[in-house]
Amino acid sequence: MAGPSTLWETLQALLPHTKEELKLELGEKVEGSVLMLLQEAAELFLGGQRRECLQTCEVLLDYSWEKLNTGPWQHVDKDWRRVYAFGCLLKAVCLCEPPGDAASVAAALKACDMGLLMGAAILGDILLKVAAVLQKYLLSGKRPAPGPSQEPPGTKKARNDHVPIPDVTTERTVPRLHCPSLQYFKKHFLVPGRPVILEGVANHWPCMKKWSLEYIQEVAGCRTVPVEVGSRYTDEEWSQTLMTVNEFISKYIREEPKDIGYLAQHQLFDQIPELKQDISIPDYCCLGDGEEEEITINAWFGPQGTVSPLHQDPQQNFLAQVMGRKYIRLYSPQESEALYPHDTHLLHNTSQVDVENPDLEKFPRFAEAPFLSCVLSPGEVLFIPVKHWHYVRALDLSFSVSFWWS
């Protein structure tokens, strides 16, 4: 492991050296007293008073955290997210001042992740750069060689509840194609809005051979991520929490918890570029109207039994399966009335029906709605057309990657 002084020098090279370069100008929504506190923290940092800077940052973070958690997320002013990001940045770097130990660097990395998750981009995505340096430093100090006592990936107490696997041979299955041309895919599936499984499109991605629980822990274990807790997001007891990937794997995959945990719909690949290098954007996305930067790539990682209730999304979707299998049902948007969407604005894109155990007295028309189904296996990519209703259940420990595009 490189020494703390080397780490400090690397971080110093990334950071602005004057208050002007920090660009602390913020909008009118941020109170003057908060801006003064932020400027004070910057002056303390640049003046070498790291302990005092750390204390000031904690006050800033506590106050801006309250602002971030007041009202709906989409109404949170971006400048408050910038305040939070600046606080996280200064805190992270202060924690790494020599002689910073591994625990301090881990705390600094958590501060960066909190800034990435809750803050807004500042100084050319500097939090991403600092996080990458800190992660590399931590990994260089603990990269254990697999020993004879280690079990194969995912076997140590991985949940094994023998979940039922639907017999899709009795259902109308999603058609399959092997590497169709762009023109054929566009004419027969994209334009008419027909689901299809694409085979041979993702087999060459590095993730197909590299990814295992051990690899994910090695590359991402120390990173803080949002985790959904509960059977499905429509349940009353459903909640979200933040924890490291290592904690998530230990609590919800290695052990047998009473609740299901799911790292769902998270832009993990923006947060951890090392994982992004293991996947590719499907060529078919070029048929869309947007730029490549506008494609939203999400991770879906969890134990067997995770469920995404029947819902629809406002964009085209390629769902690539990397680890494990998923049972998926698809309904055309024309069947919406028979799927009984929730009345509330928040859940209007989600059906009230429990797909595999429907209450047909309450939702009689659901039984008549035609659907397609499939079991999606590693290396396969499912095209889910825009607004197509889809229900997803993991049959195994599973990692999927979704690409939303317009």
UniProtKB/Swiss-Prot annotation:
The gene is KDM8. Residues 1-99 are annotated as: Interaction with RCCD1. Residues 158-167 have a biased composition (Basic and acidic residues). Fe cation binds at residues 311, 313, 390. It comes from Bos taurus. Residues 143-167 are annotated as: Disordered. This is Bifunctional peptidase and arginyl-hydroxylase JMJD5. Keywords: Aminopeptidase, Biological rhythms, Cell cycle, Chromatin regulator, Chromosome, Dioxygenase, Hydrolase, Iron, Metal-binding, Nucleus, Oxidoreductase, Protease, Transcription, Transcription regulation. Binds 1 Fe(2+) ion per subunit.
